[in-house]
């Protein structure tokens, strides 16, 4: 199931360019993420942040700079591509998402053909930005998190023996673990 949220779709008019207000047709921004299912916590956080940002920017401008629509992908790559295509049909010009890595990789592969600007706020696999020149990543990558964790433990002498519990079937968890395992060897810790 696809859940959509949309701001009003009015064309701003009557404002002069000298006033500093945007007076053109609103820019259509799409969002994709899991707002239902196991990863809904992440998707809802991003959805709420995007919605708030659009409302605040439009309010500060006095007219609609952005139209925004968000689609639920349930953290599923195929549903994310379907959501992407639905947003393209809506007229999306910029994609703020997807939220999680696996759906982002699937959508990024599609977006290259369309030269759609894609900016994920939270998909953290290092391979996300390798899909095309149109795909950007705002957050830290999985390897960055593994390095930071290992550095923190080593710098603060927190342990000499470490056990790691991670989900080998999850790209996010595995990515952090792989880099952590490599980096923790610099310390006197044993995994």
Stretches found by the model and what they are:
Residues 1-28, 59-60:
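Short, low-complexity disordered leader/linker segments with a strong preference
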Residues 14-23, 30-49, 71-77, 100, ...:
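Extracytoplasmic "Venus flytrap"
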Residues 15, 56, 191:
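Acidic-residue sensor for enzyme active/binding pockets
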Residues 17, 41-46, 60-127, 138:
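Beta-alpha junction/loop-to-helix N-cap segments that form part of ligand/metal-binding clefts
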Residues 25-28, 62-67, 90-95, 113-118, ...:
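Loop/turn elements at helix/coil->beta-strand transitions in domains of secreted/extracellular proteins
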Residues 35, 135-190:
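An alpha-beta-alpha
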Residues 44, 48-55, 78-89, 93, ...:
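Solvent-exposed, polar/charged alpha-helical surfaces in well-ordered, non-transmembrane soluble domains
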Residues 47-68, 182, 186-188:
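Signal peptide-proximal N-terminal region
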């Amino acid at each position: 199931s696809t859940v959509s949220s949309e701001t009003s779709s009015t064309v701003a008019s009557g404002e002069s360019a000298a006033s500093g207000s945007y007076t053109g047709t609103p820019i259509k921004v799409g969002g994709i993420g899991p707002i239902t299912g196991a990863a809904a916590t992440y998707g809802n956080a991003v959805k709420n942040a995007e919605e708030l940002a659009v409302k605040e920017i439009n309010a500060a401008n006095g007219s609609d700079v952005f139209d925004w629509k968000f689609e639920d992908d349930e953290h599923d790559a195929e549903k994310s591509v379907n959501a992407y295509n639905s947003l393209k049909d809506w007229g999306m010009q910029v994609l703020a998402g997807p939220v999680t890595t696996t759906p982002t990789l699937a959508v990024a592969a599609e977006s290259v053909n369309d030269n759609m600007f894609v900016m994920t706020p939270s998909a953290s696999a290092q391979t996300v930005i390798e899909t095309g020149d149109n795909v950007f990543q705002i957050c830290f990558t999985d390897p960055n998190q593994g390095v930071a964790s290992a550095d923190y433990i080593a710098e603060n002498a927190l342990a000499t023996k470490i056990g790691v519990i991670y989900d080998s079937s999850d790209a996010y968890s595995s990515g952090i673990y792989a880099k952590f395992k490599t980096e923790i060897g610099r310390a006197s810790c044993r995994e």
